[in-house]
């Protein structure tokens, strides 16, 4: 992996964001996702690499493009594994709400955990708390540790939690400690990454979300030096989701075992979910969000705001790109 490849990976998420943003606010979440998928796959196909989707839009029989195991790129060059979410926060995009973005994680072949389409209990925190907070602790314990690490009182801390019924007790505990809760409807990747940057007002992410997005978050947090832990959730009684209405705990355990996951209660650290020597996160805003703006359409150009985090050179680059239209007469600053 090199800087040229990283630049092309940036362009992959930019093109996906632009395609999806054309449908922002139209209430068409499936169409917005499909547009992002097609644009992402098209741009990936132009890269000199032996790419492979390890986390994507589903199994081969469930998704026509960017399915798990699909080969992308020219077929020549370095081997690269991808975990992709072309339109993270499809509902946010469809309703023109904050926080939707096109995201991916990339690493050398074999460098990303092939997360099953399960749920994952997650804990993300700033670099100062790395290895000190622990997902095994109660929220109360972690807030006390986080307070000490950051030099803030607990009532100055903000914790992001997915707004789900399953988090009722977690939210009650956090508020009972005096910390602030910021509920989000979708899109916990951006919230996790925000924990890695001072000044965002986000100090911690707690709770259960999708496992594939957990791998993408872990890649970003590993590159940032932040704290991230994840533990797969296989009990429908804990997940409390209609998607698992016909699933059983025993059936889910069997599914995990069939995937080669025998230590079903393992707690994964960031460097286990994203274990490659070179790890890259790339995200581009579809709608405005905490870390960057969404796509802006102007008469003579389209503007994108993106973030690339890389272990290759230990950088986090915020990039504003002006995509100039044919025949443009005037480009404003």
UniProtKB/Swiss-Prot annotation:
Pfam families: FBPase_glpX. Pathway: Carbohydrate biosynthesis; Calvin cycle. Its cofactor is Mn(2+). It catalyses: beta-D-fructose 1,6-bisphosphate + H2O = beta-D-fructose 6-phosphate + phosphate; D-sedoheptulose 1,7-bisphosphate + H2O = D-sedoheptulose 7-phosphate + phosphate. Signal peptide: none annotated. Keywords: Calvin cycle, Carbohydrate metabolism, Hydrolase, Manganese, Metal-binding. Its EC number is 3.1.3.11, 3.1.3.37. Mn(2+) 1 binds at residues 33, 57. InterPro entries: FBPase_class-2/SBPase. GO terms for cellular component: cytosol. Mn(2+) 2 binds at residues 85, 88, 213. Gene3D superfamilies: 3.40.190.90, Fructose-1,6-Bisphosphatase, subunit A, domain 1 (3.30.540.10). Substrate binds at residues 88-90, 119, 164-166, 186-188. GO terms for biological process: fructose 1,6-bisphosphate metabolic process; gluconeogenesis; glycerol metabolic process; reductive pentose-phosphate cycle. Belongs to the FBPase class 2 family. Catalyzes the hydrolysis of fructose 1,6-bisphosphate (Fru 1,6-P2) and sedoheptulose 1,7-bisphosphate (Sed 1,7-P2) to fructose 6-phosphate and sedoheptulose 7-phosphate, respectively. Homotetramer. This is D-fructose 1,6-bisphosphatase class 2/sedoheptulose 1,7-bisphosphatase. It comes from Prochlorococcus marinus (strain MIT 9301).
């Amino acid at each position: 992996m090199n800087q040229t490849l990283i630049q092309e990976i940036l362009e992959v998420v930019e093109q996906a964001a632009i395609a999806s943003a054309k449908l922002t606010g139209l209430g068409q979440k499936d169409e917005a996702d499909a547009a992002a998928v097609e644009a992402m796959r098209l741009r990936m196909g132009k890269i000199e690499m032996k790419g492979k989707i390890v986390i994507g839009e589903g199994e081969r029989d469930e998704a026509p493009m960017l399915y798990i195991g699909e080969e992308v790129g020219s077929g020549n060059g370095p081997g690269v594994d991808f975990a992709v979410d072309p339109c993270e926060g499809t509902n946010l995009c469809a309703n023109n709400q904050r926080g939707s973005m096109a995201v991916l994680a990339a690493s050398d072949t074999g460098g990303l955990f092939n997360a099953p389409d399960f749920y994952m209990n997650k804990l993300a925190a700033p670099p100062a708390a790395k290895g000190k907070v622990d997902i095994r602790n109660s929220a109360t314990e972690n807030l006390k540790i986080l307070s000490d690490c950051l030099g803030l009182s607990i009532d100055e801390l903000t914790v992001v939690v997915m707004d789900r019924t399953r988090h009722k007790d977690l939210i009650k505990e956090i508020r009972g400690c005096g910390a602030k809760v910021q509920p989000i409807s979708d899109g916990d990747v951006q919230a996790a990454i925000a924990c890695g940057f001072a000044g965002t007002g986000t100090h911690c992410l707690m709770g259960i979300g999708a496992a594939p997005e957990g791998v993408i978050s872990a890649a970003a947090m590993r590159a940032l030096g932040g704290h991230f832990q994840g533990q797969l959730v296989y009990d429908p009684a804990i997940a409390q989701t209609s998607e698992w209405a016909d699933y059983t705990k025993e059936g889910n355990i069997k599914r995990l075992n069939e995937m080669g996951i025998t230590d079903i209660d393992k707690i994964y650290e960031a460097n286990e979910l994203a274990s490659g020597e070179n790890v890259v996160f790339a995200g581009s805003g579809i709608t405005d969000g905490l870390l960057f703006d969404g796509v802006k359409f102007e008469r003579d150009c389209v503007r994108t705001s993106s973030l690339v985090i890389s272990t290759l050179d230990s950088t986090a680059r915020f990039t504003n790109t002006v995509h100039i239209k044919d025949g443009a007469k005037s480009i404003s600053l």
